[in-house]
Amino acid sequence: LPGFVRERWHADFVVNHGTVMRPAECPGLVARLDGERVGLLTYHVDAQGLEVVSLDSLREGVGVGHALLDAAEAEARRQGCRRFWLVTTNDNLRALGIYQRRGMRLVALRAGAMDEARRTLKPELAEIGNDGIPLRDELELELQLD
């Protein structure tokens, strides 16, 4: 798992909302297709709810991410969490659509959060993200669980 995290995130940690988080030390859910690992979601549970720490799909367009999010939401409900949430970046347009179609709402914009993380915590963060979009901001999405 640490090697997978390092390969996908270019370090053994991710930075969400200014906090260093280590996916390999978090509980996780693995997606398999025909016996092959095709996805990983890691999460953290606290008083705020279940936060998705990392989500990686190695096969786009076949429902890996959806299945992992479904399983994580079910885990949040099982643990009695009232909130299922995550942080993504401003360049992650496809995922933003997926999250919102799932009923998640945008609840926070952290303008400049990626610039700050690059400057203070993770200098290896790319400056340009998906589709040539400058990687600058974080967006927080949540689903209230009742």
Set out the residue ranges of the language-model regions.
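Short secondary-structure junctions
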Residues: 12, 106-107
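Conserved acetyl-CoA-binding loop-helix of GNAT-fold acetyltransferases
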Residues: 62-74, 93, 97-101
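Conserved GNAT acetyl-CoA-binding A-motif
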Residues: 76-88, 98
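Conserved beta-strand-loop-alpha-helix junction that forms the acyl-donor binding cleft
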Residues: 57, 86-96, 107-118
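Acetyl-CoA-dependent GNAT
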Residues: 2-60, 66-70, 79, 136, ...
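C-terminal "cap" of GNAT-fold acetyltransferases
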Residues: 91, 112-146
